[in-house]
């Protein structure tokens, strides 16, 4: 099995889910905690205390109130491990689109996320054992078609919920646990993501809004397209990240 490295400056679709497909986000506090972790752990400096907030109230975020518009200041670009381009959280899994800024930045960032959030979740729920289903997976974006579709794919993931009879765009506009609202220009979690790259790619917030509405109308067709692209990419760029190594796997 050959060893590989995640390309510095590369863009990666990162995802993981709960062990045995169990819920990893049980309530709003869990979603908020993970989203704050996306901000807090995106730093080359070590995090002093991964269990912050347990002493007073283990079910609430003590450092920032994400229930309103967050007042967190954007971090200095030189300190970032990755650019968080897009994200969506579902009850039992998550999708991230990351651009690596530092050597091993994706691995270090996901180590912090995985360890920190699992520690919080286990402490809060008085449980032990693994939370995630193995190591996180990362697929490198190697062509413009992949890059064009992945943000839509990630942001429309909540439509996999039972949305029969619901206006799909309105549903996405009201789904808070993603970066979709911020790309539309509505302040949701603006300090968490670095959106300039994709907004330039999509030619601004208004055009993003129009283009995702068009993408949703042909979602079934577009999903087949993105899965075909992903399968092609998997054969070459399917990485399993471990805490000490990065293994390049081939998929038949």
Question: Where does each model-flagged region fall?
Answer:
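Short catalytic/metal-binding and nucleic-acid-binding patches
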Residues: 1-190, 199-252
């Amino acid at each position: 099995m050959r060893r590989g490295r995640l390309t510095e400056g590369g863009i990666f679709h990162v995802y993981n889910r709960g062990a045995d497909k169990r819920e990893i986000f049980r309530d709003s506090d869990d979603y908020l905690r993970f989203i704050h972790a996306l901000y807090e752990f995106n730093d080359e400096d070590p995090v002093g205390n991964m269990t912050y907030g347990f002493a007073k109230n283990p079910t609430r975020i003590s450092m920032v109130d994400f229930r309103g518009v967050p007042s967190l200041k954007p971090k200095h670009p030189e300190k970032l491990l990755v650019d968080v381009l897009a994200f969506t959280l579902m009850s039992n899994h998550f999708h991230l689109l990351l651009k690596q800024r530092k050597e091993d930045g994706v691995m270090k960032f996901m180590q912090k996320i995985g360890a920190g959030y699992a520690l919080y979740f286990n402490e809060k729920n008085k449980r032990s054992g693994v939370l995630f289903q193995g190591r996180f997976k990362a697929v490198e974006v190697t062509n413009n078609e992949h890059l064009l579709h992945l943000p839509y794919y990630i942001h429309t993931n909540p439509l996999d919920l039972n949305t029969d009879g619901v206006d799909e765009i309105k549903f996405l506009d009201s789904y808070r646990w993603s970066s979709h609202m911020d790309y539309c220009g509505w302040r949701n979690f603006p300090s968490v993501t670095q959106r300039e790259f994709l907004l330039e790619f999509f030619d601004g917030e208004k055009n993003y809004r129009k283009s995702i509405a068009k993408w949703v109308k042909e979602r079934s067709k577009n999903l087949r397209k993105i899965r075909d692209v992903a399968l092609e990419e998997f054969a070459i760029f399917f990485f399993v990240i471990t805490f000490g190594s990065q293994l390049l796997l081939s998929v038949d």
